[in-house]
Curated annotation (Swiss-Prot):
Keyword flag Ubl conjugation: no
Family under the similarity heading: Belongs to the universal ribosomal protein uL6 family.
A Pfam family this chain is assigned to: Ribosomal_L6
An example Gene Ontology CC term for this record: cytosolic large ribosomal subunit
GO terms of biological process kind: cytoplasmic translation
Subunit structure: Component of the large ribosomal subunit.
Function text: Component of the large ribosomal subunit. The ribosome is a large ribonucleoprotein complex responsible for the synthesis of proteins in the cell.
InterPro entries named in the record: Ribosomal_uL6-like, Ribosomal_uL6-like_a/b-dom_sf, Ribosomal_uL6_a/b-dom, Ribosomal_uL6_CS2
GO molecular function annotation: rRNA binding; structural constituent of ribosome
Predominant location category: cytoplasm
Subcellular localization: Cytoplasm
Organism per entry: Bos taurus (Bovine)
Name under which the protein is recorded: Large ribosomal subunit protein uL6
Alphabetical UniProt keywords: Acetylation, Cytoplasm, Ribonucleoprotein, Ribosomal protein
Length: 192
């Protein structure tokens, strides 16, 4: 069954500017600028209102799969707005039974070196995605903090660190060592 028109709107806060160039969305906010290209999805994007404070996503004559892209684009734009206003912060904790995992941050937070994982001599090096800064927590032992504006780059960097510490050729139910995401949140607290 085809639906004639499906649309959703995203409210834009006061301190955020959104520009549309075709299907490319550029979001400017206090923490920086994010741009995202939606050219691969056949939808209409438009700004509503006198002050252009709402973004509308339209999909004409779509089937069920195509209608789902409307909400997907809205979610992506909301994440971009949240990123340029509050920023994203992921916290990761080192877990080890015997050999303490030693994490060193190099190159101003863009390179993570993991040493002594399961007592191995091999040094694992993980490069952060562009725009993501990594630091060692001062308040909590064995904790890493990843911060950035783009949720996809921050979460992808966390995944790269977690995958670097996968245990090979052992029973993973017993060998639980690794660096895992413990908390997901924002850099600045939202004013409720």
């Amino acid at each position: 069954m085809k639906t004639i028109l499906s649309n959703q709107t995203v409210d834009i806060p006061e301190n955020v500017d959104i520009n549309l160039k075709g299907r490319t969305v550029i979001v400017k906010g206090p923490r920086g600028t994010l741009r995202r290209d939606f050219n691969h999805i056949n939808v209409e994007l438009s700004l509503l209102g006198k002050k252009k404070k709402r973004l509308r996503v339209d999909k004409w004559w779509g089937n069920r799969k195509e209608l789902a892209t409307v909400r997907t684009i809205c979610s992506h734009v909301q994440n971009m707005i949240k990123g340029v206003t509050l920023g994203f912060r992921y916290k990761m904790r080192s877990v080890y039974a015997h050999f303490p995992i030693n994490v060193v941050i190099q190159e101003n937070g863009s390179l993570v070196e993991i040493r002594n994982f399961l007592g191995e001599k091999y040094i694992r090096r993980v490069r952060m995605r562009p725009g993501v800064a990594c630091s060692v927590s001062q308040a909590q032992k064995d904790e890493l903090i990843l911060e950035g504006n783009d949720i996809e780059l921050v979460s992808n960097s966390a995944a790269l660190i977690q995958q670097a510490t996968t245990v090979k050729n052992k029973d993973i139910r017993k060998f639980l060592d690794g660096i895992y995401v413990s908390e997901k949140g924002t850099v600045q607290q939202a004013d409720e």
